[in-house]
């Protein structure tokens, strides 16, 4: 899916958009089904090998939506600053579109290791032990980036 950006003067390059995704701590996963409508959920993630990955429980709302319609979007908001005197906001954000699928085996283990490196870099060994304990109780979902876009406003 590719949705054109109306304000071309605020459009970021793909490299700038990927930089926001790389630096972000959390993003919003957006999904939709005919039966339930739209559903957005904040979660942490890693960007690795041209895909967004997130972890979740074996069962739950996210998995129910993805099983019904795996076409999703994922948005990360980077730096923001309210500009009270200008009645506006400086911001940067990036969004990707893709099809969510579950990964298993060594790819799953490597992605979980990427989570430890990103969110707990001072606890790698403990993180590996945690991965081993929770491996079978965790799903890893991959969203290969089919399209990326980003916008920013800087005064």
Regions found by a protein language model. Name each.
Residues 21, 65-66, 115:
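A generic structural signal for nonpolar/aromatic side chains embedded in well-ordered alpha-helices
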Residues 61-89:
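Helix-adjacent hinge/juxtasegments
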Residues 1-23:
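Extreme N-terminal tail/first-helix region
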Residues 1-8, 81-155:
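Charged, gly/pro-rich active-site loop segments
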Residues 18, 44, 64, 86, ...:
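Short secondary-structure boundary/capping segments
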Residues 14, 59-60:
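Structural motif corresponding to alpha-helix initiation and N-cap regions
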Residues 24-58, 74-75:
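Short beta-strand segments
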């Amino acid at each position: 899916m590719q949705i054109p950006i109306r304000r071309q003067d605020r459009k970021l390059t793909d490299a700038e958009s990927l930089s926001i995704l790389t630096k972000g701590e959390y993003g919003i996963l957006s999904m939709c089904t005919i039966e339930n409508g739209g559903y957005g959920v904040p979660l942490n993630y890693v960007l690795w090998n041209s895909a967004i990955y997130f972890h979740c429980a074996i069962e739950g709302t996210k998995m129910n939506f993805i099983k019904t319609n795996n076409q999703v979007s994922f948005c990360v908001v980077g730096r923001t600053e309210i500009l009270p005197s200008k009645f506006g906001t400086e911001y940067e954000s990036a969004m990707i579109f893709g099809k969510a699928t579950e990964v298993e085996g060594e790819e799953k283990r490597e992605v979980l290791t990427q989570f430890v490196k990103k969110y707990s870099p001072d606890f790698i060994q403990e993180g590996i032990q945690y991965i081993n304990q929770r491996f079978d109780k965790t799903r890893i979902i991959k969203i290969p980036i089919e399209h990326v876009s980003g916008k920013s406003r800087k005064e």
